[in-house]
């Protein structure tokens, strides 16, 4: 093995050359990239000893291995020459170059963008991180980061049913067992987020998982990864590309719109490859579909026929277009680009082959149109061996079955007639005539005449054009597409010529002149003339006229033509009646069919009738939907004006509505809508007033309001255009009227009150707005059952509860008088101002009575419960009479009890702003005398009352936000609900008894001998009423609008100078604290009841402040006495108050429950 020389040199330290060789051997045997400088055995500076695995102990052994393994050592030395090595910079630059070249590589058969372009599209102007942890990037597909995937509660809230973990075991460490109990299906894909990782192997599996989750389970899928920007995004994009046929850029941008994704470049490269593969597969599929038939328009665009039929189908499905609309658009796009289906040479070759094979069996072909029918309709079933042709035929059959089913033989006979009548003309000329008209025909009609053309070309020489079913259908389809190609070229050529010469060329041809004539005569004949008409008059047509044109397209104007009568149709631009081609029931397509037959010289109405059968089934859904809409609107009109009994046919057949539809009648609709809409407000008013009078047993018929002069069409109908203009005028006038009324409301309640009665008939809706003052709830409470009373929104006080139970007769009477005649019917052009004035006076008298009583009660109850007025009343102590005080308290307590017992409507009367309330007082010092005083006196009192309302230091609801005009407005509107609570006037008697829950309290000389029991009673009453109103609020569907306005806002917004705030008494604070603690058990009701108390107290203070201005001295003395009574009651134990209040609350609850059951 070793020579002598080798043995001698054994002890020599290896030379440089040997070192190089040793390194090479090490690299070869050990694959050790950088051997240690020191030997592991002896720490000697010898590299050979390091190679323990092959036990080389000397440089000789290394040399021998080098000699054996690497024959020319010189070459190795040269390769290691430093001059030959690339520097690190060069290597980096080269690597960068290679990477950029890969990223910019856009070599693709299908124009797939390069990776760099994809990255630019994703980054756009800046790179973003996702805003949210989870985003829904496709319906029911969520991309999320790790934190969402491990948050089971959030998954449950999102409704996730499937989880695709793109970082299974590589970042998101969950698994099927992690989601046990959540009914979540899990698929984990173990992929690292590195460019060199192959994620494409998981594309198909992940996409199928997503597809199954979405389609089979109708679930929601969460695709999770570490950050939700790379791996998960790539899997979702692959799903969109595979199952939704998206191109790579479209799929990426679809996801990017919803979430900032940034797949790494390796993944983008794999998506590119997937895109190429999918495009190739689809091209092969399309090639199989149309390759045999040679009917391809280009790469994967489908057959010409398929495109046309698709266009037809899309148009049919489009709601805003008819089944004929848009046909000219389709024509333009198809004809503007001459379509090259196959090369001419290729076509010639195929044609020759076809002729050879076809000659054998030509004698077996039937001699009428049935042969072509069997060729087309029988082909799919009989020639299953040829899948490609079968596919095309099935597509054709499924989409055109309604045309093929009945008509081919008739078409054949028709074509024969055409040939006889047109014997002198050549086939080419015939074809040119057809293609002339093709630029103007609809998509569906185009399909028909293509078939006819094929028939016609088949007929002259059956030996050349026919073949039996057993023949190769491929060649027949080639021939057919060849003819189709010729037709299309001619059509496009003709189309371009026409577009240049406009209609000048049309005049030269029969078809062109006919088309122009039709276009002038009627908008309803052909879809393409519709298109031209609309494009020419696009700027002139209103929305209504466009709708009418659409209606003609839909064929509704011809609905009743089967009987032979034609209803006049006022045109959009030209009011020319629609021509009736025949007495047959026609649709737009059938109209075209007849015209087309006239063009080519024959007319076959039976065929058109046959076509109608198929077409009706095709358009059934759409027509059914329209008819249902029309029927529904007709029923709505009939219900709201039941006098009108006009037929649906006349309304649907013509674009007009009978005059009788607009006369208000005896309506029966229940108004639960938003009465802010002008027309609905008026109609609700009229028919609800009718309902109210019926309930009262005094039903009267609503007087009909005369219509303005409208242009009347045939059959006593009105043109819809004129109706539209007229309605616009009425609406604008009504709006102006409403604005004027609102201005009146802000000026004086007596003027404003004319709105209270009609509006009152609307059942407790959230009428117009709180400021506008239509307190329509006032009568609503009478109309509704007790348990359903709807409290109209606003910050009413406790006492606003009507005592309708105690005064049914009065409420009925006021109902009848208030609403038996509607002041405004649906389209009121004239208003009886005298009647309004009379009603206003009656109402105002009632309101003044009720409000004076109410005001007294409120003040009494308020001052009984609060010592806030103590300081103000000291000065004018002497002026007040005891009688008034007793009367106040009496009425107040009675009203409390009545209101808490009768869970009738909580009306919208707020505490009736201080201005109006004090005006009621101003007209007389005695409440009893108020009943007779007139509106003029009331108004004069209003004018003299200019003192600002009193502002408290705890202003309650939105009172502080209103200016004087809105206070007046609110007063008027809300006090109207006291119309029927007349029974309170009996409570003026200072010795009257009032009953609540079988509890009789004698409140005669209350203030001379007030005791702690009475104080407790008052607390009990006030609190229980708050509770009662809040609990009744539960059952009412109407929202309550309670606001707590801070005192500062009231001071800022009130236009009048402020009075100094009165100090808050300890007694009131006690009451408030106890009410807070008691109401806390009511949860959300607590703040409502408290603000309820506050608004009430605030209204009372305003009223009291106004009264204090020198008007009601006697009342003031009693108030002062009441305040001193309150001071006595301050010593009362809070526990007693709470106990009494709770007892009262329980009683109220039981009563409410009973009332609900009743």
Curated annotation (Swiss-Prot):
Residues 132-280 form the Tyrosine-protein phosphatase domain. The gene is STYXL2. This is Serine/threonine/tyrosine-interacting-like protein 2. GO terms for molecular function: MAP kinase phosphatase activity; protein tyrosine/serine/threonine phosphatase activity. Belongs to the protein-tyrosine phosphatase family. Non-receptor class dual specificity subfamily. GO terms for biological process: negative regulation of MAPK cascade. CDD domains: DSP_iDUSP27. SMART domains: DSPc. GO terms for cellular component: cytoplasm; sarcomere.
């Amino acid at each position: 093995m070793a020579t002598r020389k080798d043995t001698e040199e054994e002890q020599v330290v290896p030379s440089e050359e040997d070192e190089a060789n040793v390194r090479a051997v090490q690299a070869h045997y050990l694959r050790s990239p950088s051997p240690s400088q020191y030997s592991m055995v002896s720490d000697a500076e010898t590299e050979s000893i390091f190679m323990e695995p092959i036990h080389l102990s000397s440089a000789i052994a290394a040399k021998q291995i080098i000699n054996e393994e690497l024959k020319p050592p010189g070459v190795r030395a040269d390769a290691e020459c430093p001059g030959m090595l690339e520097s690190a910079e060069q290597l980096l630059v080269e690597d960068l170059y290679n990477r950029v070249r890969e990223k910019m590589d856009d070599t693709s058969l299908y124009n797939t963008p390069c990776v760099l372009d994809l990255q630019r599209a994703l980054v756009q102007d800046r790179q973003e991180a996702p805003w949210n942890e989870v985003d829904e990037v496709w319906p029911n597909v969520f991309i999320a980061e790790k934190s969402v995937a491990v948050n089971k509660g959030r998954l449950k809230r999102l409704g996730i049913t499937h989880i695709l973990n793109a970082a299974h075991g590589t970042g998101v460490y969950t698994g099927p067992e992690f989601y046990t109990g959540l009914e979540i299906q899990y698929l984990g894909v173990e992929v690292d987020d590195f460019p060199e990782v192959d994620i494409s192997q998981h594309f198909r599996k992940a996409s199928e998982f997503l597809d199954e989750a979405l389609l089979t389970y109708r679930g929601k899928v969460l695709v999770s990864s570490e950050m939700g920007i790379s791996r998960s995004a790539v899997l979702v994009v692959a799903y969109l590309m595979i199952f939704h046929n998206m191109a790579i850029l479209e799929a990426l941008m679809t996801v990017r719109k919803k979430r900032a994704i940034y797949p790494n470049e390796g993944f983008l490269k794999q998506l590119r490859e997937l895109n190429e593969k999918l495009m190739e597969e689809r091209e092969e599929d399309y090639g199989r579909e149309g390759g045999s038939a040679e009917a391809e328009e280009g790469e994967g665009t489908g057959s010409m026929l398929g495109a046309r039929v698709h266009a037809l189908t899309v148009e049919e499905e489009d709601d805003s277009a008819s089944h004929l609309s848009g046909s000219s658009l389709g024509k333009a796009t198809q004809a503007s680009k001459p379509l090259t289906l196959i090369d001419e040479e290729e076509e010639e070759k195929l044609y020759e082959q076809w002729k050879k094979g076809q000659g054998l069996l030509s004698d077996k072909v039937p001699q009428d149109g049935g042969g072509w029918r069997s060729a087309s309709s029988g082909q799919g079933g009989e020639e299953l061996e040829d899948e490609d042709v079968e596919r095309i035929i099935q597509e054709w059959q499924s989409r055109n079955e309604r045309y093929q089913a009945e008509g081919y033989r008739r078409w054949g006979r028709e074509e024969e007639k055409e040939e006889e009548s047109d014997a002198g003309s050549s086939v080419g000329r015939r074809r040119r005539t057809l293609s002339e008209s093709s630029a103007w025909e609809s998509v569906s009609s185009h399909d028909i005449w293509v078939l006819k053309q094929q028939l016609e070309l088949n007929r002259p020489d059956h030996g050349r054009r026919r073949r039996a079913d057993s023949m190769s259908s491929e060649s027949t389809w080639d021939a057919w597409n060849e003819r189709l190609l010729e037709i299309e070229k001619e059509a496009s050529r003709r189309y371009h010529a026409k577009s240049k010469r406009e209609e000048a060329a049309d005049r030269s041809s029969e078809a062109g002149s006919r088309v122009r004539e039709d276009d002038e005569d009627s908008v309803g004949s052909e879809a393409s003339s519709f298109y031209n008409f609309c494009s020419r008059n696009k700027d002139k047509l209103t929305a209504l006229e466009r709708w009418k044109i659409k209606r003609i397209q839909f064929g509704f104007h011809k609905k009743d033509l089967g009987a032979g009568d034609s209803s006049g149709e006022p045109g959009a631009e030209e009011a020319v009646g629609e021509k009736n081609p025949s007495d047959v029931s026609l649709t737009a397509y059938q109209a075209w069919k007849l015209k087309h037959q006239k063009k080519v010289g024959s007319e076959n109405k039976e065929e058109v009738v046959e076509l109608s059968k198929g077409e009706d089934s095709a358009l059934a859904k759409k027509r059914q939907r329209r008819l249902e809409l029309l029927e529904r609107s007709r029923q709505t009109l009939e219900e709201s004006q039941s006098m009108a009994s006009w037929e649906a046919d006349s309304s649907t057949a013509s674009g007009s509505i009978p005059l009788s539809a607009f006369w208000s009648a005896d309506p029966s609709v229940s108004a639960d809508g938003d009465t802010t809409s002008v027309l609905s407000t008026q109609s609700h008013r009229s028919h609800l007033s009718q309902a109210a009078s019926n309930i009262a047993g005094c039903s009267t018929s609503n007087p009909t309001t005369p219509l303005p002069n409208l242009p009347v069409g045939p059959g006593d109908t009105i043109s819809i255009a004129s109706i539209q203009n007229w309605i616009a005028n009425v609406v604008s006038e009504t709006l102006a009227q409403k604005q004027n009324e609102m201005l009146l409301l802000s000026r004086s309640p007596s003027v404003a009150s004319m709105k209270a009665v009609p509006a009152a008939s609307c059942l407790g809706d959230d009428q117009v707005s709180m400021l506008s003052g239509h307190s329509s709830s006032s009568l609503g409470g009478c109309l509704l059952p007790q348990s359903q009373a709807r409290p109209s929104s606003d910050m009413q006080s406790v006492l606003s509860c009507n005592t309708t139970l105690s005064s049914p007769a009065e409420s009925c009477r006021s109902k009848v008088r208030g609403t038996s005649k509607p002041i405004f019917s649906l389209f009121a052009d004239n208003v009886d101002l005298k009647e309004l004035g009379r009603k206003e006076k009656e109402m105002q008298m009632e309101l003044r009575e009720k409000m004076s009583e109410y005001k007294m009660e409120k003040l009494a109850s308020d001052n009984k419960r609060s010592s806030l007025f103590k300081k103000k009343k000291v000065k004018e102590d002497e002026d007040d009479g005891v009688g008034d005080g007793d009367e106040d308290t009496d009425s107040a307590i009675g009203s409390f009890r009545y209101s808490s017992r009768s869970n009738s409507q909580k009306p919208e009367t707020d505490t009736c702003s201080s201005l109006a309330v004090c005006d009621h007082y101003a007209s007389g010092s005695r409440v009893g005398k108020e009943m007779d005083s007139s509106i003029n006196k009331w108004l004069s009192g209003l004018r003299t009352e200019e003192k600002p309302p009193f502002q408290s230091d705890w202003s309650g609801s939105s009172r502080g936000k209103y200016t004087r005009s809105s206070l007046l407005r609110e007063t008027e509107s809300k006090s109207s609900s006291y119309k029927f609570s007349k029974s309170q006037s009996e409570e003026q008697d200072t010795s009257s008894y009032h009953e609540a829950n079988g509890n009789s309290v004698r409140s005669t000389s209350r203030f001379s001998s007030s005791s702690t029991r009475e104080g407790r009673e008052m607390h009990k009453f006030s609190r229980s009423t708050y509770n009662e109103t809040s609990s009744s609020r539960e059952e009412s569907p109407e929202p309550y609008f309670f606001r707590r306005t801070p005192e500062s806002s009231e001071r800022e917004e009130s236009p009048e100078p402020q009075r100094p705030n009165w100090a808050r008494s300890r007694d009131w604070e006690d009451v408030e604290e106890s009410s807070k603690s008691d109401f806390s058990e009511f949860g959300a009701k607590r703040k409502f009841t408290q603000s309820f108390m506050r608004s009430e107290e605030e209204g009372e203070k305003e009223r009291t402040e106004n009264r204090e201005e020198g008007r009601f001295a006697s009342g003031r003395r009693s108030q002062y006495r009441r305040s001193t009574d309150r001071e006595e009651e301050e010593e009362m134990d809070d526990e007693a108050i709470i106990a009494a209040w709770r007892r009262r609350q329980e009683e109220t609850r039981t009563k409410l429950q009973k009332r609900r059951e009743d």
